[in-house]
Every structure is written in C-alpha cells, then in structure tokens.
UniProtKB/Swiss-Prot annotation:
Pfam families the record matches: DHBP_synthase
Gene name linked to the record: ribB
Binding site for D-ribulose 5-phosphate: R37, E38, D42, R150, P151, G152, H153, T154, E174
GO molecular function: 3,4-dihydroxy-2-butanone-4-phosphate synthase activity; magnesium ion binding; manganese ion binding
GO cellular component entries: cytosol
Family matches, as PANTHER family: 3,4-DIHYDROXY-2-BUTANONE 4-PHOSPHATE SYNTHASE (PTHR21327:SF38), GTP CYCLOHYDROLASE II-RELATED (PTHR21327)
The protein, known as: 3,4-dihydroxy-2-butanone 4-phosphate synthase
Keyword Transport: no
Binding-site residues, Mg(2+) 1: E38
Amino acid sequence: MNESLLTQFGNSLTRVEKALENLKNGKGVLLVDDENRENEGDLIFPAETITVPQMAMLIRECSGIVCLCLTDEKVKKLGLTQMVSNNTCTYETAFTISIEAKEGVTTGVSAADRVTTILTAVKDDCKPEDLCHPGHVFPLRARAGGVLTRPGHTEGTVDLMRLAGYNPAGILCELTNPDGTMARLPQIINFAKKHNLTILSIEDIIKYKEIVT
C-alpha cells in the first residue's frame, strides 16, 4: 500500500475514526487492500441502514456484484451453504449461495429489491424460509477474528460495522472505472474526493484493532 497517497486523509488511526463516524451516520466509506493483494477498493455501507439511493450508487459506480458480509454465526442461522464445497479462489473469498427476499420484491434485481433482500436478511428474526435461492444479493462469510485472521474486504467490512456499533453485517461492492476496469488507488482517491467519502485501508483496521481494542 502506498501509504503516502493516503496521508492526505490523516494517519491510520485518524482514518479509522473518520470512517467509523461516517458509518455511524449511515454514510459509506471506501476500503482498500494492499497493492500486492487484490489491489482494489470497495465501497461499503452498513447493512441495516442501506438505502435505495445508496444501492443505486453501488450498482452504478461499482461492479454491480453487491455482497452482504456476514459472520459465520449469521450464515449458519440463515441456512446458507457455501457456493462451492472446494474453494479454489486465489483469496478464498467465501461466497455462499445467493439470496432473494421471499416477499416484497419483483425480479429482485432493482436497487429497491436488493435493499429489501438485505434488510430482510439482516433482521434478527430472519429465518431460512424468509429467503429464496438463487438471488441477486451475494452473501460473504467473514472469518472469525476479522482482519487479524484474514486481511480481506469481507472481514474489514464486518470489523468496521462492529466497531461502529452496528450488527456485524455490511454491504460491499468493488469500485470500477467508467470503462469497466478496476479502480486502483489513484482513481479510488479521486472518487473519494468527488463524493466526499472517507478512505481507509485494511492495514489501518489491523493497526487500530491491535492498539485500541
């Protein structure tokens, strides 16, 4: 990670604190990983406060593959099996089967329908029978221990939601450029400035958890 590019947003602890404040206010933040890993930035929002305009932004500005990051406990409670039994993905991204709300949606693909699906899934009393499969929202199972166990966007998202006082469930989608290529750090920073978003790295969260928690 080119730390010098991020210093304009403060030091590691300041960036995390700014991100947590924005999340507490229902705003999104941009989370980047190491250049030697995926080298991508994800736009993330708290799952329990996601709005239709925010979902539309995720669909419009990002890859369109909107993911719901959940704890292993929640994944089991919802009866979500892993998408594949043998995960050969380079970074072992833990996709479960996709989901749709059983009620309150049409085709499931619109911004409003995806919000309905997410708000249904993150309810404390949501049961497996409240969801159907396949769907247009893609749950990801975070590893226990968060970024200290796996330095991924999934774990970073769940960690940030916990630290912000939410239930440990968040939305992420990878930021892309207008031509469809993946946004790298310079483009991610420009996007953050344009939309007045906080940016932080997974390494920032690791440092924060080691020092503060």
